A protein has these predicted regions:
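Catalytic alpha/beta core of large soluble enzyme barrels
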Residues: 134-136, 185-189, 295, 308-315, ...
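Internal maturation/activation junctions in enzymes
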Residues: 70-72, 173-220, 224, 246-325, ...
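Flexible loop/turn segments at secondary-structure boundaries
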Residues: 29-33, 57-58, 76-77, 104-106, ...
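Contiguous, well-ordered alpha-helical segments that form the cores/surfaces of helical PPI scaffolds
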Residues: 5, 9, 33, 148, ...
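Hydrophobic/aromatic-rich, well-ordered segments within soluble, folded domains that form packed cores
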Residues: 228-246, 452-465
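Alpha-helix capping and helix-loop boundary segments enriched in small/acidic/polar residues
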Residues: 1-2, 21-26, 41-48, 80-84, ...
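Active-site cavity-forming subdomains of large catalytic enzyme subunits
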Residues: 1-171, 186-200, 215-222, 267, ...
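Glycine-rich phosphate/pyrophosphate-binding loops
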Residues: 17-22, 30, 243-251, 437-440, ...
Length: 484
């Protein structure tokens, strides 16, 4: 693990650092050592770690029964078996997540049961892990292609009593987004051809460059066979607020589900239409997929679409995801992914020269450096202020800011004070309409206990989430700071 982690830290491309997900099945006899791998400070810092947990283990943990680990984990005649206390091992997972934010949990039976690509497991599409942020469960050599649609941009008259969501425009754009993603697959294949051509002209002998060439061969084959895409969203939190709803309420969850259901049906319709024009993905077989739980939900919602899938196939083996969209949300100036706003208003500090006349020193640190504090407003909170007639240029006191937030739809709907259990239930409800997975972090205050983490993880499993991660403030030092 340390070697993989260090290798990832050493890799960079165009200023971007490497990313890595390490995962191990709870059924593996070394699972406990894996769970403890990041408890020592400075260890495995170049990777995210998650445990692949099956339904049998969860049931044993909840009921206090023993659980059998084995190696090989999928063998009918394993070389080694070991009975473990499932409840104690589960409590260790919970404790470590509470203390260090890792490991995350991947509910593996839910992932594989719901996975359309796993209908083709014997053809090389057996899911083995996820991409680094967990939003796309992947088979070997496949690619993680992401596109995010800004949900806030479809709210007409945001933050007013007349606010509504433009479903017609949304469906039009989702339909086009799926086509763009399919074009991106072709672009990727062209780039792979160029890479392989370059390898062929390299001066090294075939024995040296053969390993890299054959790796790209496998990636190209898998990408072309499945044409997997990842159409997703960002700005869910801002969309909910702009509609006059509060994140974490049942009303907001129901509305979000309707949006994601529309997205799923439209993206799949687009993929079917492309199958008619361009051909279905290479290994499509209606008989293999007809009883997949995700497709059966599509059948219940739109019988005609399901019938067309069975008749014409799809251009893409799977279409949807919800990524963290951290950088994307900076560009759109919105909340990220399906997350609530982290804080609508917060303070930042900038270092200043105390000898400058125009400077106001608000803080001096332990080494004597002077800082000026300034208020940062979430952009869509400022939009709410403008719509409701508040002066966005005024320098408000903290008391006035608290009063403004309390009157806004962001009140009690930030990362640290949202109803966390309801947030997990919302993730599970939306997951029913996302064929891949959803990357979510449940942010918690520093003073919560391990029992809450336990409740959240168990609820995530019961709600149908494919994975879950929690982050308790200051669990990993001072990565995040909140100032009153």
């Amino acid at each position: 693990m340390e070697r993989y982690s260090n290798s990832t830290r050493e890799v960079a491309q165009d200023g971007r650092r490497g990313a890595l997900m390490l995962s191990v099945s709870i059924k593996h006899p070394d699972a406990e050592a894996f769970i403890d791998a990041k408890m020592t400070e400075g260890k495995v810092t170049g990777a995210n770690v998650s445990v692949k947990i099956d339904d049998e283990f969860m049931q044993c943990a909840v009921e206090g029964k023993p659980y059998t680990q084995q190696f090989p984990i999928d063998s009918k005649e394993p070389q080694f078996t070991k009975d473990v206390d499932a409840k104690a091992l589960w409590e260790k997972i919970v404790h470590n997540a509470w203390k260090s934010a890792e490991p995350g949990v991947l509910f593996w039976d839910t992932i594989t049961r719901e996975s359309i690509p796993d209908c083709y497991a014997d053809l090389g599409f057996r899911t083995v892990s996820t991409n680094p942020c967990g939003e796309i469960p992947l088979c070997p050599y496949d690619s993680c292609r992401l596109l995010s649609i800004n949900l806030y941009s479809y709210v007409v008259n945001p933050f007013t009593p007349e606010a509504y969501f433009d479903f017609d425009l949304f469906k039009k754009h989702v339909f086009m987004a799926q086509r763009i993603m399919d074009d991106i697959v072709d672009l990727e294949l062209e780039k792979i051809d160029a890479i392989m051509a370059k390898i062929n002209t390299d001066p090294q002998n075939d024995e040296v460059k053969g390993t890299e060439y054959h790796l790209w061969e496998k990636i190209k084959k898998k990408s072309g066979m499945g044409r997997r895409t990842g159409v997703g969203i960002t700005a869910e939190g801002d969309m909910i607020a702009a509609m006059g709803l509060r994140y974490g309420t049942q009303e907001a969850t129901d509305f979000s589900v309707s949006v994601h259901k529309t997205l799923a049906l439209t993206a799949y319709r687009s993929s079917v239409e492309m199958a008619k024009e361009r051909g279905a993905f290479e290994v499509f077989d209606a008989k293999r997929e007809e009883n997949n739980p995700f497709l059966l939900r599509i059948k219940d919602a739109d019988a005609e679409l399901y019938a067309d899938i069975m008749k014409y196939g799809r251009r893409n083996i799977a279409c949807l995801t919800i990524a963290p969209t951290g950088t994307t949300s900076l560009m759109t100036q919105t909340t990220s992914g399906i997350e609530p706003v982290f804080l609508p208003v917060y303070k930042r500090r900038r270092k200043v020269n105390p000898n400058d006349e125009a400077v106001h020193v608000d803080y001096v640190d332990e080494v004597g450096d002077s800082f000026e504090e300034y208020i940062v407003y979430h952009k869509k909170f400022m939009t709410w202020m403008e719509v409701n007639g508040y002066d966005t240029t005024k320098k408000y006191t903290q008391e006035e800011i608290d009063h403004l937030v309390a009157k806004s739809p962001y009140y009690k709907a930030t990362a640290n004070d949202v109803d966390w259990l309801m947030k997990v239930k919302m993730q599970g409800a939306i997951q029913k309409w996302v064929d891949h997975s959803i990357s979510v972090t449940v942010n918690l205050p520093n003073d919560v206990d391990e029992q809450l983490v336990n409740r959240l993880y168990v609820e995530a499993w019961r709600s149908g989430c494919k994975g879950c991660t929690i982050y308790r403030a200051a669990a990993c030092g001072t990565i995040l700071r909140c100032s009153p």
